[in-house]
Regions:
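The feature captures the beta-strand-to-loop junction immediately N-terminal to the Walker
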Residues: 39-41
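Conserved ABC transporter NBD signature motif
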Residues: 62-74
Length: 251
């Protein structure tokens, strides 16, 4: 059974005294442990769709289920990571990671070793006591990722998490995300404008149309894992990137 299933999802909202049709008849599913990415032009509803799946935003029509259950609001088995790290300046890296544990009223003392292990896993061992202003942008995003993983959610939603980073840092974090995903075997929904990033990371890519966002095509990616950066230099990779660019009308 798919861990995520969307059927006929639409979203309309009022903006500037007029109705905005953000999403129209979106249908897709994701299997357990699958890495699924949404790509499309700005304003096509990628982030809106992600928030609907996460229970952060109501849909206007259609059905969304996670583990066979209708999504009626935020769920404890879903972790979230956004484009900016959204860390509290007055909390250390470790304290920021433990924040959702406190919000969920879990035992922070019991989760502390897990938080330390995750920070080590993302390469931040020794920075547990550092504050956000002492960390680079890439390091802050690693803290944000650790925070999303600390209570072991089954599903991870990532909304352009590396969009503000330089290309070198972005590639390093793509490798980190792949490694962590392969170790932890989460289902990931990922939003990006970067087609190469989508192809590198994904099993399945939803290519979306301009507003109102629809699924233009679902593209499957079958490159074996683990994938290395040099994959991006191959003709096969370039061909798939070009195929998606053609679907988007930017080839």
């Amino acid at each position: 059974m798919p861990i995520i299933a969307c059927s006929g999802v639409s979203k309309t909202y009022r903006g500037n005294a007029r109705l905005v049709h953000a999403l129209d008849d979106i249908s897709f599913s994701a299997e357990p442990n699958e890495f699924v990415t949404f790509v499309g032009p700005s304003g096509c509803g990628k982030s809106t769709l992600l928030k609907i799946v996460g229970g952060l935003l109501d849909r206007s029509a259609g059905d969304v289920t996670v583990k066979g259950e209708p999504v009626l609001g935020p769920r404890r088995d879903i972790g979230l990571m956004f484009q900016t790290a959204v860390l509290f300046d007055w909390r250390t890296a470790l304290e920021n990671v433990l924040l959702p544990v406190e919000v969920l009223r879990l035992d922070a003392t019991a989760y502390r070793p897990r938080a330390q292990d995750i920070l080590k896993m993302v390469g931040l061992e020794g920075f547990e006591a550092s504050y956000p202003n002492q960390l680079s942008g890439g390091m802050q995003q690693r803290v944000s990722l650790s925070r999303a993983l600390v209570y072991e959610p089954d599903l991870l939603l990532m909304d352009e998490p590396f969009g503000a980073l330089d290309e070198f840092t972005r590639e390093r974090l793509n490798l980190e995300i792949q490694r962590i995903w392969m170790e932890r075997r989460k289902t990931v929904l990922f939003v990006t404008h970067n087609i190469s990033e989508a192809v590198f990371l994904s099993d399945q890519i939803l290519v979306m149309t301009p507003r109102p966002g629809r699924v233009a095509r679902i593209v499957r990616v079958s490159f074996p894992r683990p994938r290395e950066i040099r994959l991006m230099k191959t003709p096969e990779f370039a061909s798939l990137v070009f195929e998606i660019r053609e679907i988007l009308g930017v080839a």
